[in-house]
């Protein structure tokens, strides 16, 4: 996907125009323009030069940008400063203009004697002040008329036409009044003085500038999360070059470089510890505040903070391949895409401005035909032009997506695209892979059952001595228990691993063995006791590791992949949301049922082979929108097949690449949080679109004078004020998403 900066856009009509122009370029398969960030995402084989040329022909500017530049492009500080200057300067001259145009009606002190009865001087002063304000805000006229010439009128065109119409008619009225005064027709002079709309033209420009400034400030807030991620990126690294430690820009670090990180420093790139021990704060990536101990062979990530010892690391992933860069790209790409619901606004935006101009012209003609004065008719037409707001339509969706995406990023929930944000809230079924998702993904000792006259320590001593030599996954659970209890083990002679059965060896000349029921029962005389405890452990959904010494049963160790602490809570939250929760596992039905009951799922599908998960998901999708949650390589096909694939962040890169949503904290409760966030974001988009459509549906007829019979009319100045605030309201409403309760905490306290 190629990214471009777009210059000159002021409203949704602009973005629609650019999108339409670029979509016609040969080789472009898809194009999405984001009005919020003034950026464009293009997929296809088209050359940069052809794309930039198409944008230029549409009346705008374009330049190619790199991923690392994206957040910098979201900065709004630079446009706000000149807007603020324009607004303050315009406001000063506007107040002076209002003083002359409304004199004693507005101010308590009189006009200078020069203007006493001098209507021409009064009119010329208003004209001059209006010209000054128009020059200050010339951007609207340059952009508006340039777009009109290119056949792509935008919001600036509406403002420019409205201000020009008000100024033009007022200038005509001033000329007519001057002519009447020279002729001595004072009645006509008074009439034309009432037709001055200089203050309307000035007020339109000043209020629209204020609205744009507030909008830009609010839009800047929506990109705070993305900018915050960028700011995490370290700027330099201490690498070993030619045997010496040198400080270089992080961009110069290459894969394989050896770098040193001291306490308090950020880790510059993803790597692996080769020397030293430390505790690393990974909260910037995972959200977990507890530091993680690091020792040789442990991996470290860019932008995490080394808190204690000095560590020497080897660079594994640099530049755009680091975890931080991938997160930034994911957040940025998600904000650059559009959900399906945005298509409605896009279609309307494409014809909005020409339609408004046509309505304004028709409004003027109709009022003139009815017999109203030219001033009244033109005022109604100007009101139509300046109250109409395509920006509110254009911003309704992208601001909500940006804020919702940022809210997710701050909580370790990453959506890969806008469609994922939109669809996650519509889920009816959530399928959870058992291993590593519901459970810890590693076996642990859950029970120790020594035989009569045998202590736990004696049993663990023999078990640990045997399992120390084994490479079986279950051996790790026993060895971990041995280390935890600090039990010493003995060397084993004649060790032999029997696949499918168990382990055999000698300790101090005595034959010892460990394994499954079938293997041990064939070599012991205590079959009844052995069977009872084996059945008990198996019925609990655990794996019995049975041990014997000198043909006598000495005890059983129960091993199981236990469920995570938050699994039951996570499943419970999903069920409360009306979602059907399914657990997928390769275990037998008996074991799967026990784990499923402990987790609280609605349905258990057992005996699912790795390559069969995709087929199970396909069947579930027939019953409703389905999400697959997993973390392993064998989950990738199912993650891709599901309506929404959700990867647990601690899983493999393959699973993360295949998913639509990534949970960085590896916390299952974030599945429910992602659904709540999606629902909140979609609700916010609906609110924004409703406001945008409702505002224009009511505002345009009101401005046109459709309710004059009811005594309701709209002065162009109030129309401009409404327009300037409409976009601000949309953006401000989107910012409310930052307060969304995605973890359901408020309900618990009510």
Roles of regions detected by a PLM:
Residues 16, 29, 337, 344, ...:
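Conserved ATP-binding TGD loop and adjacent catalytic N/P-domain core of P-type ATPases
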Residues 1-123, 244-245, 325, 329-337, ...:
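Flexible metal-binding regulatory segments at protein termini and peripheral loops
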Residues 25-49, 53, 195-196, 227-321, ...:
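Conserved cytosolic catalytic loops of P-type ATPases
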Residues 185-187, 202-263, 294, 344, ...:
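Juxtamembrane coupling segments of multi-pass membrane pumps/enzymes
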Residues 106-120, 149, 168, 407, ...:
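Membrane-embedded alpha-helical bundles of multi-pass transporters
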Residues 82-236, 347, 716:
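Transmembrane helix-loop-helix hairpins at the membrane interface
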Residues 85, 304, 425-471, 501-582, ...:
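ATP-driven catalytic headpiece of P-type ATPases
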Residues 285, 344, 379, 392-466, ...:
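Conserved catalytic phosphorylation-site environment of P-type ATPases
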